[in-house]
A protein has these predicted regions:
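Conserved glycine-rich cofactor-binding loop
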Residues: 12-13
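Active-site helix of classical SDR
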Residues: 121, 157, 165
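Conserved glycine-rich Rossmann-like NAD(P)H-binding loop of the short-chain dehydrogenase/reductase
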Residues: 26-43
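Substrate-binding pocket helix/loop in short-chain dehydrogenase/reductase
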Residues: 97-98, 105-110, 192, 203
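Residue(s) in the substrate-gating loop at a strand-loop-helix junction
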Residues: 141
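Short C-terminal tail/terminal secondary-structure segment
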Residues: 146-149, 223, 234-248
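Alpha-helical segment proximal to the catalytic Tyr-Lys
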Residues: 126, 170-174, 231
Length: 248
């Protein structure tokens, strides 16, 4: 395989970092996006990964802004080359029961978690089609399948992401482009580490596997889906949730 360029949006979070790490280990030239490099400590993050042997590039971009994504795409392809692999990871939460949720918190979650998939994918899918190869993976959530208290915005966005996946897979398959979803369950990250112990134990008690997922569990699924050999897997939703939710 020639070195393919892989773009991972929001790749400096817990799950995103491991995706970047595993794709880099697999021989991809990995680039990520961040909104506020200074606040997010991206330079220190990238330096730590370089110490491990992973040279991860980064560009500043608000993925909720279509025009910003267009500028980002120009910058990425000028510096790193054509993007053949896209992993849409960027996401936020703004939790509240719907009867208490304000419009800004609804819109911000839909913009970052769902509209960003269009904003970013739109910049690269044409090139993938023209080259006859592309791998797009959208990171959704078990809560997009089950719903969750206080997360009408998040659940709607994550459910919508897989609808986006299925439709785009049908459009793109004739051109050698695959589009798939990975839906994590509860994963051990800094966010879940901050949950009170009793709450975290109650969550784990609901998971048949008896543990939280690890970022590596999600990243391995992504690495599998973006491989050249995975070209016949298209429009799928891969649950990585320890049997918390099972469906067909």
């Amino acid at each position: 395989m020639t070195e393919r360029v892989a773009l991972v949006t929001g790749g400096n979070g817990g799950i995103g970092t491991e995706i970047c790490r595993q794709l880099s280990s697999g021989g991809y030239r990995v680039v990520t996006t961040c909104v506020n490099p200074e606040a997010e400590g991206v330079e220190a993050w990238a330096a730590a990964l370089r110490e491990e042997g992973h040279d991860i590039g980064w560009v500043q971009c608000n993925v909720a802004d279509f025009d910003a994504c267009a500028r980002m795409a120009t910058e990425v392809e000028a510096e790193f080359g054509s993007v053949d692999v896209l992993v849409n990871v960027a996401g936020i939460t703004r939790d509240a029961f719907l009867h208490k949720m304000d419009a800004d918190n609804w819109r911000s979650v839909i913009d970052v978690n769902l509209n960003s998939a269009f904003n970013v994918t739109r910049q690269f899918v044409t090139g993938m089609r023209e080259r006859g190869f592309g791998r797009i993976v959208n990171i959704s959530s078990v809560n997009g399948q089950t719903g969750q208290f206080g997360q009408t915005n998040y659940s709607a966005a994550k459910a919508g992401m897989h609808g986006f996946t299925m439709a785009l897979a049908k459009e793109s398959a004739p051109k050698g482009v695959t589009v798939n979803t990975v839906s994590p369950g509860y994963v051990r990250t800094s966010m879940t580490d901050a949950i009170p112990d009793k709450v975290r134990e109650a969550i784990i008690g609901q998971i048949p596997a008896g543990r939280l997922g690890e970022p590596q569990d999600i990243a391995r699924a992504v690495a599998f889906l973006v491989a050249d050999e995975a070209g016949y897997i298209n429009g799928a939703n891969i649950p990585v949730n320890g049997a918390l939710f099972c469906s067909f």
